[in-house]
């Protein structure tokens, strides 16, 4: 199985266009040693030719341009994207579908709740129906694994996660199973398993067992502290209110990952305020000590 990190930042990317927090300002003036990052999206393949796109970020055009296998050049109009999975209906995970309209129809896998959001509050399915058939919906059943013809050697298993629907959603304050999912992706040939959850608000005992049975954990790295947005003076909501488990503190992501010594551990969906973006920070050094990696645009993983 091939996993390509197309984008590794949270919504807004890094540096965020309108932000002058210590990270964004430091990156712009050159005083901060860090890498620019686009908004979160990955691609998965069983052969390196045909790819399943997981989330379509607003930065999708630049992301595809930077990864040559996404343009195999077999015809005058071509793409390596064989299917698209939407983990949720967040703006920063779905807006890229608009930029992919020239390639419609696209096979899109998502839950009932995500499809509902993208047919009402942010009606992408209706909007894109005017482009060569638009988006062909394939329902993700929460209690069933599924396969995708573009990558027949991979099995996808959805995991309903405790998180939050987007601010535009008609049920923003009425959460439902399927608002946000994680994925177990298993290579049926090698047995390798990827656990992918860019939006993870809580890890309970059953989910921890699932993570322990995986080989690579690609998990929510949004915030270092739960009140980070407040500390940085750029927001009022906590990580938990936004559906993101912070790395630091009791019950935080690092405490969870400490219980999983065998797995390769990688943080993704990193907010522009997170001090781990600073490669010289104490927080980044703590991740190195714990053998927890920080995803970056262009990172490749094989398992």
Curated annotation (Swiss-Prot):
Signal peptide: none annotated. The keyword Nucleotide-binding does not apply. Keywords: PQQ biosynthesis, Transport. Pfam families: Lactamase_B_2. It comes from the Bacteria. Pathway: Cofactor biosynthesis; pyrroloquinoline quinone biosynthesis. GO terms for biological process: pyrroloquinoline quinone biosynthetic process. Belongs to the PqqB family. May be involved in the transport of PQQ or its precursor to the periplasm. This is Coenzyme PQQ synthesis protein B.
